[in-house]
Amino acid sequence: MAGKEIYHKMKDKVKDAFSSSGPETGKGKTKLSGKRVKHGYHLVKGKSNHPMEDYLVAEYRQEGEHDLGLFAIFDGHLGHTVPDFLRSHLFDNILKQPEFLSNPQAAIRNAYQLTDAKILESAAELGRGGSTAVTAILISSENSVNLVVANVGDSRAVISKSGVAKQLSVDHEPNKERHSIEKKGGFVSNLPGDVPRVDGQLAVARAFGDRSLKKHLSSEPDVVEEPIDENTDFLILASDGLWKVMSNQEAVDEIKDFKDAQAAAKHLTEQAVNRKSKDDISCIVVKFLC
């Protein structure tokens, strides 16, 4: 199947995943530099009364002579409009950067900032909410595949190498960035029985949107590159609905024997629900096969 056909097929499937509030699931596959890549995703709405605020992307594209795998989790708060906007625009903005192939880290940083600026400009339409983001881009060259992960907030990327979990993203917690927040004139609350919050409101120190808090928040992503080699088993992307109740290594151990990526993603979300996670849960598993 041609790259454009794969892209449209997967894009349509993921868009369809938000037509209801029930569990949604899907999968796809491709070849990158001779390596078989299979992915699966699963989403479950949490216990809150608001509509589903987790969105994801799982698709393949071509950029010049390079085949790409594009995967992302967007965990919204105070509404679904910002994560929905990110799902539709963030990867397009990244790929439009002229230095994307030569310097993907710089391209991603620029695109994150440009996208956040657009969200803030469009606050009248998009509302006062915001979103985390974790993006993972597989870039194939003639003989290798490289993974570039970026994130703001607490949605997480974890890779399994020979069965050992390695976190590629950074959890942007308010306490960790207290100095920066206070330097900008904000504060971090630490009320008994609650998590630390920026200005007593938001439980992450970096996010897209959140116009009312933006003076004290950052949308600057942490970005890291990781080679996909013979020791790479799979990649997990998930919102904090999973990570609140499961460690990185526990997640890897739960699915290490799964051959089907979709079944693995579904299993992780079900385990999170069984462990009393009340938040929306979205999970993507990307498996790498020789």
Curated annotation (Swiss-Prot):
Record-stated family: Belongs to the PP2C family.
Protein name: Probable protein phosphatase 2C 62
Enzyme Commission identifier(s): 3.1.3.16
Protein residues bound to Mn(2+) 1: D75, G76
Any single biological process term in GO: signal transduction
Keyword Hydrolase found: yes
Entry cofactors: Mg(2+); Mn(2+)
Residues holding Mn(2+) 2: D75, D240, D279
Domain PPM-type phosphatase, first and last residues per copy: 38-288
Chemical reaction(s) catalysed: O-phospho-L-seryl-[protein] + H2O = L-seryl-[protein] + phosphate; O-phospho-L-threonyl-[protein] + H2O = L-threonyl-[protein] + phosphate
GO terms for MF: metal ion binding; protein serine/threonine phosphatase activity
